[in-house]
Regions:
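Conserved C-terminal alpha-helix-loop-beta "cap" of PLP-dependent enzymes
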Residues: 16-24, 268-269, 273, 344-384, ...
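Conserved glycine-rich beta-strand-loop-beta hairpin in the small C-terminal domain of fold type I
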Residues: 306-320, 331-345, 359
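Conserved core of the PLP fold type I
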Residues: 61-206, 217-238, 403-414
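Conserved core segment of the aminotransferase class I/II
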Residues: 93, 235-313
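PLP-dependent enzyme catalytic core of the Aspartate aminotransferase-like
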Residues: 2-12, 54, 67-69, 73-77, ...
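N-terminal "arm"/small-domain region of PLP-dependent enzymes with the aminotransferase-like
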Residues: 2-70, 74-75, 80-81, 360-363
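Conserved active-site segment immediately N-terminal to the catalytic lysine
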Residues: 206-208, 212, 225-249, 270-271, ...
Length: 415
């Protein structure tokens, strides 16, 4: 923070006075979740007119009727090209990739994977969790009673020495969560070496799987950063079965109202499909067709995402500018070039207090600790900031409150 070497008591008193002014404003601001703004959602309103009559619902079949358990052919073609995989390596499944991940793990727990013993009959099982990471991932493995192990993130992805040591030597390790492109919350893109090392893993457990969540694969702010295709890399080494890839259009079109997909080897998809055929007759084919008609090709998806970037960039710049102006001396953060979040590391032992003060002032953040398994951040320092939803003026004010609270929490411990 600016002037941190000046009189601490004087700075603390000034920030307390500033905080009191914020309290008088009766604020109600929420930057806790990565929700698209109304302006972003409006970019996809063409979906609502993509189908104009019942005739538009006819493809190789009448898509108003039953059938096509794992997606209509048109959607499979579009999104297999989008994911850079073969058309027989994808399934179109509902509206939520998180739901697919939950379902996939549930099936592994109850039925086992490709003939292996169900996970819930194998005693204690473990899961690798790159940190800081996505809170909803951790909630899934916690719900199933799986022991979660922290793996530190580096600027190139998870610490692969740690990953390889666990996966290649411990048969109780059954999976790892990954957000490989513009990671949640840091915005890191896994480099080629990291992806290649994932593809070359030699798991001690035959039922180990990488849960590769491509939530932000086209969410660049300016120039897109390339990333190796994990499934194709794994195929080179005869290792395709260790990969599950997930994605959705939730932050491309309508949040929670888009379509979601899973990409994997034919072996994995066949294993999943045999249970899926009991679970459902099929998903919303009309919504799938609407997305196909709206986009038509992959290039149009990228053009669409540039419109999102135009709306998001000014908001992320507000966060960067405010952090730099107010907290540069004591806090650290990644300057993301894509994705939906900013990860800020405050002085150790101050994150909870900072967000408590912010909440009392009417500004809500993702709770401290949420970016770690069991909601426990050992350093009590990491805060996830979600700039996407509020208008710029509200975001500026929220960030000012955040920085004020961070300073107060810091000086409470250091005076």
């Amino acid at each position: 923070m600016k002037n941190s070497n000046s009189n601490p008591e004087k700075i603390y008193a000034a920030e307390k006075s500033r905080y009191d002014e914020f309290l008088k404003m009766n604020l109600s601001l929420d930057i806790s979740r990565g929700k698209p703004s109304s302006e972003q959602l409006a970019l996809s309103d063409g979906l609502l007119t993509a189908l104009k009559s019942s005739n538009d619902c006819i493809g190789i079949s009448d898509y108003r009727n039953y059938g096509f358990l794992d997606g209509i052919p048109e959607a499979k073609k579009l999104f297999s090209e989008f994911m850079g995989i073969d058309v027989d390596e994808i399934m179109i499944l509902g509206n939520s990739s998180l739901n697919i991940m939950y379902d996939t793990l549930q099936k592994a727990m109850q039925f086992g994977i490709m003939g292996n013993e169900p996970l819930n009959k194998q005693g204690e099982i473990k899961w690798l969790c790159p940190v800081p990471g996505y809170d909803r991932h951790f909630s899934v493995t916690e719900e199933f009673g799986i022991k979660m192990i922290n793996v530190p993130m580096t600027e190139n992805g998870p610490d692969m020495d740690i990953v390889e040591n666990y996966v290649n030597n411990d048969p109780s390790v059954k999976g790892i969560w990954c957000v490989p492109k513009y990671s949640n919350p840091q915005g890191i893109v896994y480099d080629d070496e990291t992806v290649s090392r994932f593809a070359k893993l030699k798991p001690a457990a035959p039922d180990f799987r990488i849960y590769w969540d491509n939530a932000y694969m086209v969410h660049a702010f300016k120039q897109d950063l390339p990333i190796l295709n994990l499934l194709k890399e794994a195929e080179k080494y005869g290792n395709a079965d260790i990969v599950y890839m997930f994605g959705s259009t939730s932050k491309i079109t309508y949040a929670g109202g888009g379509i979601a997909f899973m990409a994997a080897s034919v072996n994995n998809l066949n294993d999943f499909r045999k249970h899926l055929s009991v679970q459902t007759i099929g998903y919303d084919k009309i919504n799938q067709l609407m997305h196909v008609k709206f986009f038509n090709n992959v290039e149009n998806i990228y053009k669409h995402m540039r419109k999102h970037a135009d709306l998001l960039c000014p908001k992320f710049q507000v966060v960067m500018d405010t952090l730099q102006e107010e907290l540069s001396d004591v806090a650290s953060w990644y300057n993301p070039v894509g994705g939906y979040f900013v990860s800020c590391d405050l002085p150790e032992g101050t994150a909870k207090r900072t967000l408590e003060l912010a909440k009392n002032a009417g500004v809500i953040f993702t709770p401290a600790g949420s970016t770690f398994p069991y909601k426990y951040d050992p350093a009590d320092s990491n805060v996830r900031i979600a700039p996407s939803f509020p208008p710029v003026d509200e975001l500026k004010l929220a960030m000012q409150v955040f920085c004020c609270c961070a300073k107060i929490a810091y000086y409470e411990k250091n005076i």
